[in-house]
């Protein structure tokens, strides 16, 4: 009833926006899309849902917190759904709007459409990424962000041992180790989600950690580590195995 009291003659739509990069915790409450749909239908106004980061795969089956998928929103009755082309979707930076044809057609006629539309290169890149989603297995395998967040801790640990061995064999002026850590997803939809992971640690002998971190960030292929307890942490979940030897070579220039 509280939501309906806000509807006036000039109300043209109901908009539900994902909190995206933050969460309000404690004694709080938020209206759901299921509650808004009948209100919108009763007053004959469209409902728009901004999902933040576009999620096309139910990530809860991989042990992550459930996030509403684009398909869920459409299935429940949202008239227009908008979301990002990058972030969890894994494509180029873009805004995507889907929904009922009559509303999409109105947007196409708006004068701002020409100014805000993406270029052909972005459209081509986005098309290739979306084609991966024709097979969930293929998307998980080929899109880096999905592959990283769904990789098992055992597999991450196995790769961490490999990176540790490569760095040790590079004879760096540092102590190389391994420690459990947590990967934080963020990405516009999962700001509080943390995944158990494994980090390779570097304790330099002849250079301070802040100085080493700075020089790592200025390499030709920047390495962005996490620092704590006078130690460099490389979260292996976020590193492709094909870069392990390159990382060892570049660190060899600094240590």
Positions of predicted regions on the chain:
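PLP-dependent enzyme catalytic core of the Aspartate aminotransferase-like
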Residues: 135, 204-255
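Well-ordered beta-strand positions enriched in small/hydrophobic/aromatic, beta-favoring residues
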Residues: 14, 95, 198-200, 234
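Conserved PLP-enzyme active-site core in the AAT-like
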Residues: 3-4, 8-133, 168, 250
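Catalytic-core signal marking the mid-to-C-terminal active-site face
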Residues: 166-229
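Short glycine/threonine-rich loop-to-helix capping motif typified by GTGT followed
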Residues: 61-65, 154-155, 189-193, 238-244
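Short acidic (Asp/Glu) and glycine-rich catalytic loops that position anionic groups and cofactors
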Residues: 53, 102-108, 135-145, 191-196, ...
């Amino acid at each position: 009833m509280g939501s309906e009291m806000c509807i006036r003659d000039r109300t043209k739509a109901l908009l539900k926006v994902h909190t995206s990069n933050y969460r309000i915790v404690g004694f709080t409450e938020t209206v759901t899309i299921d509650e808004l749909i009948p209100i919108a239908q009763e007053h004959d106004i469209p409902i728009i849902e901004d999902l933040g980061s576009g999620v096309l795969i139910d990530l809860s089956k991989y042990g992550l917190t459930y996030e509403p998928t684009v398909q869920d929103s459409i299935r429940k009755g949202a008239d227009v759904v908008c979301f990002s082309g990058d972030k969890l979707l894994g494509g180029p930076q873009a805004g995507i709007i889907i929904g009922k044809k009559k509303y999409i057609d109105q947007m196409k006629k708006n004068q701002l459409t020409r100014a805000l539309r993406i270029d052909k290169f972005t459209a081509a890149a986005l098309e290739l990424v979306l084609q991966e989603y024709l097979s969930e297995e293929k998307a998980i395998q080929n899109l880096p962000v999905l592959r990283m967040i769904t990789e098992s801790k055992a597999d991450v640990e196995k790769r961490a041992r490999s990176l540790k061995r490569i760095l040790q064999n590079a004879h760096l002026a540092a102590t190389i180790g391994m420690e459990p850590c947590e990967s934080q997803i963020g990405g516009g939809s999962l700001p509080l989600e943390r995944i158990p992971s494994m980090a390779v640690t570097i304790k330099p002998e002849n250079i301070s950690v802040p100085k080493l971190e700075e020089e790592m960030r200025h390499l030709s292929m920047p390495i962005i580590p996490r620092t704590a307890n006078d130690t460099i942490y490389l979260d292996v979940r976020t590193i492709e195995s094909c870069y392990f030897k390159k990382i060892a070579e570049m660190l060899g220039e600094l240590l």
